[in-house]
Every structure is written in C-alpha cells, then in structure tokens.
Amino acid sequence: MSATLRFDNIGKVFPGVRALDGVSFDVNVGQVHGLMGENGAGKSTLLKILGGEYQPDSGRVMIDGNEVRFTSAASSIAAGIAVIHQELQYVPDLTVAENLLLGQLPNSLGWVNKREAKRFVRERLEAMGVALDPNAKLRKLSIAQRQMVEICKALLRNARVIALDEPTSSLSHRETEVLFKLVRDLRADNRAMIYISHRMDEIYELCDACTIFRDGRKIASHPTLEGVSRDTIVSEMVGREISDIYNYSARPLGEVRFAAKAIEGHALAQPASFEVRRGEIVGFFGLVGAGRSELMHLVYGADRKKGGELTLDGKPIKVRSAGEAIRHGIVLCPEDRKEEGIVAMASVSENINISCRRHYLRAGMFLDRKKEAETADRFIKLLKIKTPSRRQKIRFLSGGNQQKAILSRWLAEPDLKVVILDEPTRGIDVGAKHEIYNVIYQLAERGCAIVMISSELPEVLGVSDRIVVMRQGRISGELARQDATEQSVLSLALPQSSTALPGTDAGTETAAQQAA
C-alpha cells in the first residue's frame, strides 16, 4: 500500500511553545488513519499545516513522494486536500447551498445562477444521505447541522486527502452513522483520510491505523489496531494510567438550593420543573433536540420565558437576562465555546478574571492588576492549563484548555451558587476530562448546585448524583444514581414508540444506536 501523504520530521514553534517536535508518519491510500492525543498535543496544529494555515518551521510534507509546501488554504485545496477543523468555519448569513459552493458558485457572465446552485446541492446532499435544506441560513441551524455542512463541503470538493478534526463532537447518532458511511465509501474510493477523535469507540470502529501524540511528539504509531488495548492507547496519550476517569465519591447534600417550577418556553412541549440541592450534581440527558439546552437557556434568562418560577435558597427570584442571573450567582458554561464562552481576542488571564474583576477594584475605581495576575496564575497551575503565559490570547489554546479557562472563571467567583454546564467535555481528551470532572466536584463541595447537560451517557452515569431525562421537549423522568443504568436512562430518553426495550439485546442495541 503506497503512502499518499507523508509527514517527515515536522516541527512547529510558537512563542514559548514547541507545538510539534519531529513528527513523522504516513497516511496510505484507502486508509482511515486515526490521530489521538490530549488537548494541546499538536494534532490540530498538524492539520493546520496540512491545510495551509501554518507553515512548518522544519521538516517536510510529501504527497505521492513529492515535497509540497502550502502557503494558504487555497493552495492546499488546489492540491486536493480538504481539512475540516473542530472549530467550524462558515458564513452564518449565507444559505447551506452558498456555504457549500463558496468560491465555486455556478455563474453566467458574472451572474450567480442560484437556481442551478440549489439544484446541484440538493442532488449531492440526497446522494450522500444528508437531510439539510439548501435554502436554510447557517445561522438558523443547530451546531450539529452546521458541522454536517462543513463535512459535506469537503466531500463536494472531491479531495484526495481528507482530514477530519473531531467531526462527530456535535452530531447525533444518526448523523454520525451518515458520516461513517461517507467515510467508508471514501476509503473504498481510495482516498487517504486522517481522523482525529477523543472517542475511543469511533477510533476502533472506523480506523485502520492510529498514531498517538503527546506534548507535540509522536509517541507511537499502530499500523493496525488489532491486539492494541484501549488501556495502552490511553497510557500512550496521557503518559500515565487513569484507572477511574470519573473518580466519583459521594458527598453530603444540603437543602434545595435552586428550583425551577413550571418553566414554559417555545422549545418546550410542556412546563418543566426540577430542583437541585446544595452540593448536588444533576445530570440532564436526552437525545439531540430533546430540549435540555433550551430549558437551561430559559432558566438562565438567555431566552424569554413564557411562564414559571425560580427560587434560590428558598426565596423567589427574577431572572430576565444573563446579567441578572450572574448577579444572583447563577452561571452558564455554554456548549459553543467559540461563539458564547470565550472572548477570543482577550488573554487567558482576562478570560479567567472577566466575571470577578469587580472584586479587584481599589477605591471602587482602580483595578488591582496584581490580584488579577495571581488569580490567573493560580488557576493555570491548579487546572494544568497549557499556555506559555497568562498573557497568551485564549484563541491560540486548544479546546480543552479553553474549557478549563472558562471553568476557572467560575471557580474564581466567590459568590457562585448555581452552575449550569452544557456539554462541558465536548471535544476534550480523556486526561482533560478527568481534570474537568475534578473541577466539577470542587464546585459541588463548595455547596454549589450543579446542572450538567451531556450527550455522553457514560459521563452522565459516572459523574451525576441524580439524572433527569428529557424527551421531545418535556421531562420524561428522573433516576437516583444507584437506580440508573444505560438501559433505564435510554428507555426514558427514546420516543415512546421505541421504549419497549427491557429484556432484549436487540432492543438495547437499538436504544444505544439512537442516543446522541
């Protein structure tokens, strides 16, 4: 089998950080090559070199035995390379069709033929088995749908080499199955593919070979995954053994700290009520579109409620905006870090301290920069945030380190009472997940009421004290930790026509397959 793509001793240095250090491996024709490593290990940097966004400081990229050097995304695309990044790149106010054909819209005498563009896109989407409306604006689509647009864009270019960075991080199971079929079809068509994922199941199901990164270096390359254990890969990734990633231990729970009663909103099929005690972690599980995020946006004041009541420490409160929620000590860590969580052009220190700067004012006017720096340095060390300094722009950090900085923001807030976490470990490696779970436990031990939305069922089962399940815009049930199993949770999450699961392996498999 010939190597279509070869990375030969690739090195890349940023100020204060060696992102890649002598990385070499081959990606063969007709092969899906998995790439694994902790956040900040250098995987995405390598893909940015392949995509022409960065140039290597040393080493060579070779295609079909010839050295290539991409100085722009356009030169990479022209060479038959398609790179789909974890942080999506699209024009929100253009339609699906316009985004898919950006730069190659059919035209006549300088006029874009929109009818022909929509027809072409509709035919190609149907052929790929992707259910997207070519006329829909990207801004109106869910994150999962936007991710499918990015994937389809690469496939429409008929690329020879396709690199996917966490492509399923926001996809439902059905969308993931569509993607897997596309990848298998491309492999059969002799394309060469790189597949980055933190989901071990996907690597074993889809990949023919796998390379492991750690701290910018290639630690191992496995030409086949047969006989390679998951423990081996985890140990190669993190440099240590993680016996229990969740590290859960029971803690005493206090009185009800936060309660939502009969919350109504446009995305909910019926009023929703729940409560969370001091020190309690309540996991919210459901399929994509079940209404979990929508409910929390109503509670947080990000979306307008049609009705309902909120109480905090037994007293009624009004929350009509995110600012009002924060003043009550209620915070939301959003699913979409890039759009809603980080201030991309600000430093790591500024992002950590953004919510608690009012505590650093001297004489009510002057910011105590020393205290701000001390707080940032403390949490960078505590959460092992990989950054050359607190002054580094947060946009240059990996997704996992950005997430840790966002969590630090709330750990630094002394008046915190309620924390809502929406997919807190999406796109994050196993080592960073372990650290983030410890942060969640620290918040709970402080007496915070924690709500954790997650589409990863093992995570919900492993971290939560209690699990609330949503289905089709309503709360379908709740389970205590000791009563919760994969099957009992899924039976509450699936549409009612599919809930007759108990006792059959086939039923359990069907349930698992439909879970996000």
Swiss-Prot record:
It is found in: Cell inner membrane. Part of the ABC transporter complex AraFGH involved in arabinose import. Responsible for energy coupling to the transport system. GO terms for molecular function: ABC-type L-arabinose transporter activity; ATP binding; ATP hydrolysis activity. Belongs to the ABC transporter superfamily. Arabinose importer (TC 3.A.1.2.2) family. The keyword ATP-binding applies. It comes from Paraburkholderia xenovorans (strain LB400). Residues 5-240, 240-497 form the ABC transporter domain. Keywords: ATP-binding, Cell inner membrane, Cell membrane, Membrane, Nucleotide-binding, Repeat, Sugar transport, Translocase, Transport. One of its GO terms (cellular component) is plasma membrane. InterPro entries: AAA+_ATPase (IPR003593), ABC_carbohydrate_import_ATPase (IPR050107), ABC_transporter-like_ATP-bd (IPR003439), ABC_transporter-like_CS (IPR017871), P-loop_NTPase (IPR027417). It holds the Pfam family ABC_tran. Its EC number is 7.5.2.12. This is Arabinose import ATP-binding protein AraG. PROSITE patterns: ABC_TRANSPORTER_1, ABC_TRANSPORTER_2, ARAG. ATP binds at residues 37-44. PANTHER family: ARABINOSE IMPORT ATP-BINDING PROTEIN ARAG, CARBOHYDRATE TRANSPORT ATP-BINDING PROTEIN MG119-RELATED. The keyword Cell membrane applies. It catalyses: L-arabinose(out) + ATP + H2O = L-arabinose(in) + ADP + phosphate + H(+). SMART domains: AAA. It is a peripheral membrane protein. It comes from the Bacteria. The complex is composed of two ATP-binding proteins (AraG), two transmembrane proteins (AraH) and a solute-binding protein (AraF).
